[in-house]
Amino acid sequence: MTNERPLILITNDDGVWAKGINELIECLKDLGDLVVFAPDGPRSGMGSAITSLVPIKYTLLKKEEGLTIYSCTGTPVDCVKLAINEVLERKPDLLVSGINHGGNMAICVNYSGTMGAAAEGCIFNVPSMGVSLLDHAADADFSECCRLGRMLARRVLKEGLPHGTYLNLNVPKLPQVKGLKVCRQADGRWVREFKRSENASGEPVFWLTGAFESAKPIHPDNDMLALDSGYASLVPCKIDVTDYDFMATLNNWIL
């Protein structure tokens, strides 16, 4: 029988100094011993990128009872890999990535460093979740996000998650949400993605921008609709991306 407190690994893609991750630390600190291992600066949009051509390093920023904070020169996924392989003395009981400044709904899950880190935790068989607020402001109000994130973290610590499954929680920018809906990921894509400009030399340069366009037909239980209706969305995600329904058809192809 062990009396060890749960070990919770926290990371993000906005960097160790972002308000979101520090609000997350405050709302989870009574649930277990926290180890924060996060990028030393913004790494948004990194997805599951890893660093392979240059060395990475980490720096201890703070150590006190129940809380240790490191910064890392790598990507969010690098942070998870390095923390679990080289720094932590035991496997975490939970990984929480966030709180992200900005939403990670629909196909954004494929680009998100926040969700890339959560997926990496899942690959290590650590129950993992990403938490995002639909507000990019540096001083955003994370109150509702913290309330829901903490509630979900407590439940995951108690119940665990199925093998290969991790969670994606998104919270709208509202003083109070209507509730929490378990959803499917919205289908669609980004359109008008680049804004063309010129640099000082007159050469064309491009800024990433764009708008999300939902695919038709729109499923009524998707995360975008839930968020637009004032609900927080919770999507269970899978590491295994195999299309099992298409396997039989593919086997019948003449290759």
Curated annotation (Swiss-Prot):
Key words, A-Z: Cytoplasm, Hydrolase, Metal-binding, Nucleotide-binding
Catalytic activity from the UniProt record: a ribonucleoside 5'-phosphate + H2O = a ribonucleoside + phosphate
Single GO MF descriptor: nucleotide binding
Protein source organism: Parabacteroides distasonis (strain ATCC 8503 / DSM 20701 / CIP 104284 / JCM 5825 / NCTC 11152)
Enzyme class: hydrolase
Residues the record lists as binding a divalent metal cation: 13-14, 44, 100
Subcellular location per the Swiss-Prot or TrEMBL entry: Cytoplasm
Note accompanying the cofactor annotation: Binds 1 divalent metal cation per subunit.
UniProt name for this protein: 5'-nucleotidase SurE
EC identifiers of the protein: 3.1.3.5
